[in-house]
A protein has these predicted regions:
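Nucleotide-activated donor-dependent transferases that construct or modify glycoconjugates
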Residues: 1-9, 16
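Conserved nucleotide-sugar phosphate-binding/catalytic loop shared by glycosyltransferases and other
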Residues: 4-7, 24-74, 215, 298-300
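Short amphipathic alpha-helix
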Residues: 12-23
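Active-site-proximal region of nucleotide-activated glycan assembly enzymes
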Residues: 29, 50-52, 111-167
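Donor-nucleotide binding loops and adjacent catalytic segments primarily
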Residues: 38-49, 168-248, 282-285, 290, ...
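An amphipathic, basic-hydrophobic alpha-helix
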Residues: 65-94
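Acidic donor-binding loop of glycosyltransferase active sites
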Residues: 92-94, 244-259, 266
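A short, well-ordered alpha-helix in the C-terminal region of glycosyltransferases
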Residues: 315-327
Length: 343
């Protein structure tokens, strides 16, 4: 039995799902430990492939200050003591953390129970919790080669659902554009899509738009007032079907988006969320930009958007993705864990 912990947002949860799928292929039973907050329950409350699912009252600590931060940390320790009992009950051999605030209780519980902790870091800048726990982990997995610094750190292909690879194709010309604000939506990207919708209509370019639940009504009303037919949705677990129809993406640059779009050979204009911790979304996108595999549009350069669209080397970038070998990162993590004699 292994435990998978972490989440909060879609990027972390997508990795958790990949690990679950790989574990089931290899005959490993899994439990999941996440949070009542964030999107953990939306993704996994009905996921029967897990032997058991636990959702705790955990929340973030990093953005809190003073006594509030101390109180939140003490609450995590209290939760960790309860999780320690859960790990012992299920005779868990290893705890895999995919990051996010909901991974904290189970990660600390693993250390308390002397159960091997294995961490996946999804971003180009290591998160605060992962940075704290890294020295105590048995293995630290990353898809960013500049994070390799110690013997327990392993370069690992980014865990993505294999369907992104299976449905990959070279984009030849811009017929459809998809706006992706992430699993929670992004008002800036929504506004950018609405502002330029008439331009795309005039050019005969179809719009696919993930706008998030909180902004759905506003976006729907705006498109209707412009009499523009658009594939508008708030959230879709099977988003690959939307992505596979698109020829160009406009997206935040969370790590999962970065690698999923790359695996699908879908060129992208990344708009990093400027308030992300350690500005990690910008550095995620920069990792691809330095390899001529994307364009970056910062929010203060909004007026450059159409120029970037008109001069975007669509076919060239899409073709370059063929040079990248796509392997199953979740399979690699489990293989390495077995090689280390942990499971």
């Amino acid at each position: 039995m292994i435990a998978i912990t972490g989440g909060g947002t879609g990027g972390h949860l997508a990795i958790a799902r990949c690990l679950l799928q790989s574990a089931k292929k290899q005959g490993l039973e899994c439990i999941y430990i996440g949070s009542e907050n964030g999107q953990d329950k939306l993704w996994f409350e009905q996921e029967l492939a897990f032997h058991q699912r636990y959702f705790l009252s955990s929340s973030g600590v990093v953005n809190k200050k003073g006594l509030s931060k101390i109180s939140s940390f003490m609450h995590i320790i209290k939760l960790a003591l309860n999780v320690k009992k859960i790990l012992k009950k299920h005779e868990v051999k290893a705890v895999f953390s995919v990051g996010g605030y909901s991974s904290a209780p189970a990660s600390f519980a693993a250390l308390m129970a002397n159960i091997p902790l294995l961490i996946h870091e999804q971003n180009s800048k290591i998160g605060s919790l992962n940075l704290l726990l890294k020295p105590f982990s048995k293995a630290f997995f990353t898809a960013f080669d500049d994070q390799i610094d110690k013997k327990n750190t392993f370069f690992c292909p980014y865990p993505i659902n294999e369907v992104f690879i299976q449905k990959a194709r070279i984009r030849q010309e811009l017929k459809s554009i998809i706006f992706l604000g992430g699993s929670q939506g992004a008002k800036f990207i929504n506004d950018l899509a609405l502002k330029n919708a008439l331009y795309f209509k005039e050019k005969g370019i179809n719009i696919i738009h993930q706008c998030g639940k909180s902004d759905y009504k506003r976006c729907k009303s705006a498109y209707e007032s412009m009499q523009i037919k658009v594939d508008l949705f708030d959230f879709d677990k099977n988003i690959i079907e939307k992505i596979s129809k698109a020829d160009l993406a406009v997206s935040r640059s969370g790590a999962s988006s970065l690698f999923e779009l790359s695996a699908n050979k879908l060129p992208c204009i990344f708009i990093p969320y400027p308030y992300a911790a350690k500005n990690h979304q910008y550095f995620n996108a920069l990792y691809l930009k330095e390899r001529n595999l994307c364009e970056i549009l910062t929010q203060d350069r909004e007026n450059d958007f159409i120029d970037i669209i008109n001069n975007f080397p669509l076919k060239q970038i899409s073709s370059r993705f063929c040079e990248i070998e796509n392997k199953n990162g979740a399979d690699f993590m489990l293989y390495k864990t077995k090689e280390l004699g942990i499971i």
